Design a protein with these regions (language model features):
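Active-site region of PLP-dependent enzymes
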Residues: 29, 34, 161-167, 174-290
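PLP-dependent aminotransferase-like
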Residues: 70-158, 165
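Short amphipathic alpha-helices in soluble, non-transmembrane regions
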Residues: 207, 302-311, 387-390
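Conserved PLP cofactor-binding pocket of PLP-dependent enzymes
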Residues: 214-222, 264-269, 305-369, 401-404
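Conserved PLP-binding active-site segment of the aspartate aminotransferase-like
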Residues: 279-281, 288-298, 315, 319-337, ...
Length: 404
């Protein structure tokens, strides 16, 4: 899945150019940096590659979400609707701006169920945040229609779906704003990093300042900049941006390999009629970082996962239902409001509600789901061997369940 699997001299060259100048910060020091502006170059490359008018780099996908939420005017007491299956950072980002995360059931796209979203809208709802999990995408048209109907912002968390598209447009560029993560296990990586993309100039200007202590970047030097609003330090470094600049040039190479390997593994597992696959709203746009598949029952799925573990073939096959970081069932620290800084009353009330919320619709899907991460390093023979081992286990346990 991740770009770190295929390091090359291109990444080393970009990093060395930064080290040769000695200027690791993205802003200022115009003379000593000798014309090297890696963060600016990467932002331009993101806009060109994904078709966004503006891009603002940040230190992580989480800080990108936080920055985007603030730029969209989300704040204390506002409600943000997001899926119950997501990396915990999506939830944390909403809390970090004083807003209230509202989790809803997913469907077999593994992200927001539009019907569940409609039912969750209240007078306090400010934003809908689809999370394009595991390389694919939400039903963006349905969610955009809901946002338009209720005058809500659409913020795409595309941190896990770099390179995916929906009806010809890259995910992360369709809503009012979208975010990418470039951490170590994303399709392209900076080591750590993120980006906000938007086609709205005002949103971009706010992101640009908010991610750098409120600097308006209009002064002759940093000391002459004004600070029209509060901001924080969510800057990316030139070193991290340099790695990303090399990686984005190689994205098509990575996606081609991912899709080939994904297709080969899917063809093997498709031989088992009891297996069904994740619903992809636009199959041509799947970035293919994961192959997500379902078994008939939770009992059979758990038995398969346990046997994978026993046979040492579980690595890379994720059973999110028991995962501490990606599914709300394991988020007791959040549900209990275990924060080192006190949460506001509205947030505490929302967390209290979450503790008893019925998300059985999501449970029914996630308890039967396994996601197989797609490596860029696999050979055809390795995929064949892996797939056949997986298929053997699954068939054996399906048969055992049938004869009981």
């Amino acid at each position: 899945m991740p770009g770190f699997e295929l390091w090359s001299d291109e990444e080393r060259k970009e990093v060395n150019e930064v080290l040769e100048t000695g200027i690791l910060m993205r802003y200022g020091f115009d003379g000593p940096r000798k014309g090297k502006w890696k963060a600016k170059e990467l932002e331009e490359a993101i806009c060109k590659r994904f078709g966004s008018k503006y891009a603002q780099l940040t230190s992580s996908g989480t800080s990108a979400l936080t920055t985007a939420l603030v730029a969209l005017g989300v704040g204390a007491g506002d409600e943000v609707i997001l899926p119950s299956f997501t990396f915990v950072a999506s939830f944390e980002a909403v809390l970090s701006v004083g807003a209230v995360p509202v989790l809803v059931n997913i469907d077999e796209t593994l992200t927001l169920n539009p019907d569940a979203v409609r039912k969750a809208i209240s007078s306090k709802t400010k934003c809908i945040m689809p999370v394009h999990m595991c390389g694919s995408m939400a039903d963006v048209d349905a969610l955009a229609s809901i946002c338009k109907e209720h005058d809500l912002s659409l913020l795409e968390d595309a941190c896990q779906s770099i390179g995916a598209s929906y009806k010809g447009r890259h995910v992360g560029t369709i809503g009012n704003a979208g975010t990418f993560s470039f951490d170590f296990v994303k399709t392209i990586t900076c080591g750590e990093g993120g980006a906000v993309m938007t086609n709205d100039k005002e949103v971009y200007i706010k992101c640009d300042g908010y991610s750098d202590h409120g600097h308006d970047h209009k002064g002759g030097d940093r000391g002459a900049d004004l600070h029209p609003f509060l901001g924080y330090n969510y800057r990316i470094s030139e070193l991290h941006a340099a790695v990303g600049l090399a990686q984005i040039r190689r994205l098509d190479q990575f996606l081609k390999i991912q899709k080939q390997n994904h297709s080969q593994l899917k063809n093997i597992l498709s031989q088992i009629p009891e297996i069904s696959f994740r619903k992809i709203p636009d199959p041509a746009g799947d970035s293919c970082t994961f192959l997500s598949w379902f078994l008939p029952t939770e009992e059979i799925t758990r038995a398969v996962v346990n046997e994978f573990r026993a046979q040492n073939i579980l690595a890379g096959n994720f059973y999110w239902y028991d995962n501490n970081w990606h599914y709300n069932r394991k988020w007791d620290h959040l549900k209990n409001g275990s924060s080192l800084s006190p949460l506001n009353d509205k947030q505490q009330a929302a967390l209290q509600k979450l503790r008893s919320q019925d998300l059985s619709g999501s449970d029914a899907i996630m308890s039967r789901c396994v996601s197989s991460a797609i490596s860029l390093l696999w050979t055809e023979d390795q995929i064949k061997e892996k797939g056949e081992k997986m298929m053997s286990v699954i068939k054996k346990l399906l048969h055992a369940a049938e004869v009981r």
